[in-house]
A protein has these predicted regions:
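Conserved acetyl-CoA-binding loop-helix of GNAT-fold acetyltransferases
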Residues: 46-57
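C-terminal structural segments of small proteins and small subunits
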Residues: 60-92
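A generic "binding-loop/recognition-motif" signal
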Residues: 20, 29-31, 40, 74-75, ...
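A short, internal acetyl-CoA/4′-phosphopantetheine-binding micro-motif in the GNAT/acyltransferase core
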Residues: 38-45
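N-terminal first-folded block
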Residues: 1-36
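Generic secondary-structure boundary/loop-capping signal
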Residues: 1, 36-37, 75, 86
Length: 92
């Protein structure tokens, strides 16, 4: 597992590697986090990095009693594969 960092000023969870930065970008909306964009550099795709940053985002939301709006299609698909996250989901 890579070292996922949280930059609250930039509103992102990310993994920094020599090949680039894998990230989950969000917007804070009161007591909700809108997970609206994930990105992994092409040469790093298929290694589970997007899932790692999304998992870190859900753990942060859970620990801080926040809800998640899964606007990013990738995040929405991951919720289907991780039913334990469904309790954190709200829709705008």
């Amino acid at each position: 597992m890579s070292d996922v960092k949280h930059d609250s000023a930039a509103q992102e969870f990310y993994v920094e590697l020599p090949e680039g930065k894998a990230l989950l970008h969000y917007e804070r909306e009161g007591e909700k986090l809108n997970f609206h964009h994930t990105f992994v550099p092409p040469e790093l795709r298929g290694k589970g990095l997007a899932e790692e940053v999304v998992k870190a985002g859900f753990e942060f939301a859970d620990q801080n009693k926040l809800k998640v709006i899964p606007s990013c299609p990738y995040v929405a698909r991951l919720v289907m594969k991780n039913p334990e996250w469904k309790r954190l989901i709200v829709h705008s």
